A protein has these predicted regions:
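Short alpha-helical patches at coil-to-helix transitions and adjacent helical residues
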Residues: 47, 51-54, 79
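Conserved alpha-helix/loop element of class I SAM-dependent methyltransferases that forms part
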Residues: 53-63
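N-terminal auxiliary segments of SAM/dcSAM-dependent transferases
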Residues: 1-19
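S-adenosylmethionine/decaboxylated-SAM
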Residues: 15-39, 45, 62, 67-251
């Protein structure tokens, strides 16, 4: 059982209806190999919109050089999907790597600028024991399934961003970043991401916030406003997920 309440706007009726979907999925008559190519049968429209959203932001960076950084990977779906979108939109671009950052043990702590709740608390969004190994294996599989599989185009960075990100940037001074996806909800890691990653952006790079302008999760917005980054970016919202905010860096 999870030790937190995932943030969503789901009604009680929707929650009840989803129990039916879970049963249909668990009791599916489809063979496993057919399940894997017919996942749309069990994909809700709200979940499908996330796929369209990731395609939306990826298409904004196709002509922008640099890697993709995902902060707050959790189970890693965004990392896998962005990795496969690279294979779809630019299969021969071996220079673009998808890098995922997470503790894989949940939030280490919160600052006074964050709002503690059943969703935001120490240990929330933890994964199963050794889950990073499973995610690594999944990414290895997708790498081998796609073109130019002999060149590694993904990386997972485990640990607290406050420590791992400065070390990563020091080790990768050559790096440009085309897309930053911030899904950490908290003040301190958001501040660290902005401070460490901005020097690696180029004009046209994209910064995506998952919980901007959200009263329940003030940390991301406070860190962004304090940084002054809003003065150097064009701001828009996603066409598919209205609570996702897209910043286009103008340098």
């Amino acid at each position: 059982m999870s030790n937190y309440t995932p943030h969503n706007k789901t009604s009680d009726n929707q929650k009840s209806n989803r129990e039916k979907l879970y049963s249909l999925y668990n009791e599916s008559p489809l063979p496993l190999e057919e399940m894997l190519i017919n996942t749309g049968l069990y994909t809700r429209s709200s979940a499908l919109s996330k796929f369209f959203f990731l395609g939306e932001i990826y298409q904004k960076i196709i002509n922008i050089p640099g890697n993709i950084h995902v902060f707050g990977t959790w189970w890693g779906q965004d990392v896998v999907l962005l990795h496969n979108l690279r294979a779809i939109f630019e299969p021969y671009n071996f220079t673009r790597k998808v890098v995922g950052f997470d503790t894989f043990t949940g939030y280490p702590d919160l600052s006074e600028k964050d709002t503690v709740s059943d969703t935001l608390k120490e240990g929330a969004y933890t994964t199963s024991a050794n889950y990073i190994d499973h995610l690594q294996a999944l990414l290895d599989y997708h790498e081998k399934e796609n073109i130019m599989s002999h060149i590694n185009k993904f990386e997972l960075v485990e640990g607290d961003i406050l420590r791992t990100l400065p070390a990563y940037c020091e080790k990768n001074k050559h790096e440009l970043i085309s897309l930053i996806y911030i899904d950490v909800a908290l003040y301190d890691p958001t501040k660290a991401i902005i401070e460490n990653c901005i020097p690696h952006l180029v004009k046209g790079s994209i910064i995506v916030f998952d919980e901007l302008n959200a009263k329940e999760y003030p940390g991301e917005t406070i860190a962004l406003k304090e940084s002054g980054l809003l003065n150097t970016c064009t701001v828009e919202r996603s066409k598919f997920l209205p609570d996702r905010t897209i910043l286009v860096y103008n340098g």
